[in-house]
Amino acid sequence: MLQLGPVGLNTATLGTGITTLTEPSRVTIGSSFMRGVLDNVTTPPLEALFHGQAWGGKNYDALKKGGTSGVYEKVLAQAASIFAARPLAIYKGVSCIHGEQDGLDNNTAYAVDLAEWQADFETDLQAITGQTEDIPLFICQAGSASGYGYTSGIATVAFPSQLQQLVAHKANSKIHLVCPKYQLDYYDHSHITNDAQRLLGEYYAKAFAVVEAGGTWEPLRPTTIVGAGSTVTISFTGRVGNLAFDTTLVASATNYGFAYKDDSSRTITGVSIVNNQVVITLSGTIGANPLVSYAYNNGAGGAANQVAGLGARGNLRDSDTAVSAFDGARLYNWCVIFRESVA
């Protein structure tokens, strides 16, 4: 990392010298992410460097290239310092944890913004290092809608950034959605704990290792949602091992986090896993304009409920055997938040 790092806050400027990565009292994903890179990639680099800039409560327009915060330009200045000290350094990716303010701002074009962010970073970092390799963007899904009081569930599109992050992943091969965050612990309405930051960094490392090896990273997400009669069957990609409903690591949610809506006011009478597909049984034949959502604005609102693990959430995960290098916790792939039409 750079001196005074790993991440500069607000207007703070990091030093220009490189030093050992150590975490401040408010932990970043940096240490666990870089440790995971060194442990998990097929050909580990001689050195892994992590740096960045953060400013809480800022939307994309403030943080983007030319934005009012100057955050983007500080990251590029940091990159120039690193390249001056390590002339052979190249960038393998940009990690981003963002989306809450754009959710509050009802930014329905956030997927387009993420594509612009990736393209700008790739162009400008390539200009610094001289590399021709792609520089993908790794993101996670905002998981604090309920913490901000959004609890209307499937009925309305609100706090859209969490859905837009999934759109960006599906639409752009250089944007990788690592995971949701409802399975992590929060210390207030929107911020995860230090231990959760360490776990999140390990999730980033998992995704990075797949991409670095030339593979295609997929979070656990739906690929098809098909209705027939009074049932909806959902197929998934990104699964390692069998699907499971886990009400131990994530507090039990109504219908395991799934919700349904159509013009005939059908309701869910059962949710089950059959042959690693989720089958939703309804109170009657599927009506017009059917929708299914998962972990979407379905929690109890406010900071206290977010901290208690009762915010927006779901219980669907896979059976990945990967474990945390810090505490041995299983790094299951948890299903992303979604709200989609039934075919």
Question: Residue spans of the language-model regions?
Answer:
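Cell-envelope and extracellular/periplasmic
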Residues: 1-343
